[in-house]
């Protein structure tokens, strides 16, 4: 069925994904982006509709094809987000803010607010987005990204990896506790925050790199987080999460409940 959910892929190895069929394009007026750099990047490369509004099937197909995300994990996290943030009548979800492109509101208790909706998919203490309390929980924050770079230089030798993730996750929680009187880190945010921390070094590193004691370079991190852009000639990773030492764990991907923040 055109636009329907594709079956689990037979091939789950690395392959070129920044290809001629998926060129990066700059945002057009009205295009929607949100707190998730992974989905933002997939939309800017045409794996998702470039306007940022998609069906759950399109999102699942995109993250499986573009990032080699575990199929069962992709189904779980996408429908989890769609049930709370999407329009179940039109079967459309905004990867950013509320928009009439998803159709008319159906009334309470439905939110239909898109992934920007606070304390559902999106949450406090993001690595590169400000807390909801401060007014913008979805736009790239250069100050926070500078801290991301600082911690990557200090603890990762210029790369973002598992070691950096632990230090930075603790720092962002401490910052939110100290500055945000409405700080909320209850479920599901407790789980998505730590999944968010692991996604960049698992899926934003070229899949042809079989030994990766370094992790995600700052040049490529800037492309994904700020520009929603894959590096030139980028190959997706092997199926499953990549650990700090470069060993693939095919059973870990279902635990990734977010595509990075």
From Swiss-Prot:
| Matching SUPFAM superfamilies | Cloroperoxidase (SSF47571)
UniProt-listed GO biological process terms = hydrogen peroxide catabolic process
Extract the signal peptide range.
none
Q: Name one GO molecular function term.
A: peroxidase activity
Q: How is the cofactor bound?
A: Binds 1 heme b (iron(II)-protoporphyrin IX) group.
| Name of the protein | Aromatic peroxygenase
**UniProt: heme binding residues:** 36
Q: What highest taxon heads this organism's lineage?
A: Eukaryota
| InterPro entries per record | Chloroperoxidase (IPR000028), Chloroperoxidase-like_sf (IPR036851)
Spell out where the chain is glycosylated. Answer: 100, 137, 141, 220
Q: Per the UniProt annotation, how does pH influence activity?
A: Optimum pH is 5.0 with ABTS as substrate. Optimum pH is 6.0 with dimethoxyphenol as substrate. Optimum pH is 8.0 with benzyl alcohol as substrate, and there is another optimum at pH 4.5. Optimum pH is 6.0 with naphthalene as substrate. Optimum pH is 7.0 with pyridine as substrate. Optimum pH is 7.5 with veratryl alcohol as substrate, and there is another optimum at pH 4.5.
Which cofactors?
heme b
Its biological purpose: Aromatic peroxidase that oxidizes aryl alcohols into the corresponding aldehydes and then into the corresponding benzoic acids. Catalyzes the regioselective peroxide-dependent hydroxylation of naphthalene to 1-naphthol and to a far lesser extent 2-naphthol via a naphthalene 1,2-oxide intermediate. Halogenates phenol to 2-bromophenol and 4-bromophenol. Oxidizes the sulfur-containing heterocycle dibenzothiophene to yield sulfoxidation products, and trace amounts of ring-hydroxylation products.
Q: What are the protein's UniProt keywords?
A: Glycoprotein, Heme, Hydrogen peroxide, Iron, Metal-binding, Oxidoreductase, Peroxidase
Give the family per the record: Belongs to the chloroperoxidase family.
What PROSITE patterns does the database record attribute to this sequence? HEME_HALOPEROXIDASE (PS51405)
After translation, how is this protein modified? N-glycosylated.
């Amino acid at each position: 069925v055109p636009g329907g959910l594709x079956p689990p892929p037979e091939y789950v190895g690395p392959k070129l994904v920044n290809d001629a069929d998926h060129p990066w394009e700059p945002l057009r007026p009205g295009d929607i982006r949100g707190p998730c750099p992974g989905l933002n990047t997939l939309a800017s490369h045409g794996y998702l509709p470039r306007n940022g509004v998609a069906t759950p099937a399109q999102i699942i197909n995109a993250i499986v094809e573009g990032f080699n995300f575990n199929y069962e994990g992709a189904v779980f996290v996408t429908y989890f987000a769609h049930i709370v943030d999407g329009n179940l009548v039109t079967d459309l979800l905004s990867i950013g803010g509320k928009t009439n492109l998803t159709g008319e509101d159906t009334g309470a208790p439905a939110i239909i607010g898109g992934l920007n909706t606070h304390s559902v998919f999106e949450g406090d203490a993001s690595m590169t987005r400000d807390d909801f309390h401060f007014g913008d929980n979805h736009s790239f924050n250069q100050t926070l990204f500078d801290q991301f770079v600082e911690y990557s230089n200090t603890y990762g030798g210029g790369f973002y990896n598992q070691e950096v993730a632990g230090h930075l996750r603790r720092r962002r929680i401490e910052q939110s506790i100290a500055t945000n009187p409405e700080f909320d880190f209850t479920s599901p945010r407790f789980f998505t925050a730590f999944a968010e921390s692991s996604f960049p070094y698992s899926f934003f590193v070229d899949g042809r790199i079989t030994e990766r004691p370094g992790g995600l370079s700052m040049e490529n991190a800037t492309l994904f987080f700020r520009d929603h852009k894959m590096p030139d000639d980028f190959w997706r990773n092997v199926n499953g999460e990549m650990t700090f030492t470069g060993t693939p764990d095919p059973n870990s991907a279902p635990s990734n409940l977010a595509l990075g923040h």
